[in-house]
């Protein structure tokens, strides 16, 4: 590493660097990021792709006054390093350390927290309008990827920005990827723009030549009237300019000179500007350049060997994908939908085997849910695989388009519960609370991976709205047998016991088993453990029996307490006059920050030791 990065103590110092020093700084950042993220894990390929752009932004703007919003925010590592967080980068995504996304409480340079996609244009427009109303003239910049631009919220914002003529700069970071390869009409359109790069060079070359003479300038002014027609011929449908944005592109996102030139022009233009840069995910690390999907998000790895794929342990996502293929082979009405996450949700092989029955809609959860509703209305059996945190974006569609009509759409909520290092924007701890109040909705959760298979088979013949929630990763080493069959609304006694009954959902049954074993060893008391396969509806018959037999009851869930499973059980037990103690174990009314799940469960009293301590207090 050279001395350039080492000597930067204030981002304003970057403005004084010459072009060669800027290029050296970019290389220093790449070297630092590759070394650091290989040790901590984190978002890798996307960050390597925006380093040159980040350096150019600091050269042209003063972020003690100007504003920048990174859409999704996973590509903000270089920005964090240059804004005083380099020495803390070894704590990235660790409990108490740096967040992997922009966070307003972490730095004065993080102007808006992000984590989910497609939000930057709306927030940037809001900031630009606030600047205008407050009499300020600071620049507002939004950096958004071509994947995030497929999100409906981003398109809504573009429509409004073009109409209102907000004074902001949009930088389209076009790497032809979100996590996986982009799909859809907008991706096709951007590809046409990339193919039409010759138009922009042709326009520049002609303009430069004509500017050299007075006659040429008059000719240039006349030719400018033909600009729209030329665009229609050479570059199909200049969408951005048609809706009111000044378009600059295509710009090489790894050429600092080009970036400086276009940014120096854009910052002096009033009104909305979009700069279309083309970058390469994984730039500077050959293995990531060749396989950007594999290097999107990584665990710690050896730089010489690269990321090694792990095939030894089963997990919920891969099991879901395997079972979906089995269902589809036996039932030609089964279809799978994902919102730009075929690999993460385990549907990659399904896509290969059933391409006509697989639908990747891009980053468009709202569309995905109502698409599924339309399919269900015509007799298909749609399964929408989505991370729990991202289903929040389609609340109205689940309620309005699925539940009101009681359509048999199956929502497969991957990453339900804690996801760990991605932090508060990604923890899947709200789905029980926002789905439970919806009439006609049924919510289930497998207690182990093997039970996932049984539930999916049952779900394929369930004729009403259904949500299946399951966690990231695999099982704890607990000996559990899956249910042999599913009986609607009924729970399962996993272990007989006395005095205290634990009613747990999903993987929390495994935590309960370990806690109960500790009680057995320390107190020689058996704890009754119940697997609440059905989160909604609750098993009232079994609860009546527990109350009649005088059990103290502890509910356990990896969801927030408010509006959760435990509150539903508590409400019913109060209705029937249950006289013994009731304890609900869940996440309290707060957002759960980033860190390893084991640490976060412990801090929140939901690990086996915390559950054991609660049980001891009740004995």
Swiss-Prot record:
Catalytic activity: D-glyceraldehyde 3-phosphate + pyruvate + H(+) = 1-deoxy-D-xylulose 5-phosphate + CO2
Residues annotated for Mg(2+) binding in this entry: 146, 175
Binding-site residues for thiamine diphosphate, renumbered to this chain: 74, 115-117, 147-148, 175, 285, 365
Keyword field: Isoprene biosynthesis, Magnesium, Metal-binding, Thiamine biosynthesis, Thiamine pyrophosphate, Transferase
Transmembrane segments: none
Gene Ontology CC: cytosol
A Pfam entry, by short name: DXP_synthase_N
Record-listed E.C. numbers: 2.2.1.7
Similarity annotation: Belongs to the transketolase family. DXPS subfamily.
Quaternary structure and interacting proteins, as annotated: Homodimer.
Annotated protein name in UniProt: 1-deoxy-D-xylulose-5-phosphate synthase
Species assigned in the record: Clostridium perfringens (strain 13 / Type A)
Lineage: Bacteria, Bacillati, Bacillota, Clostridia, Eubacteriales
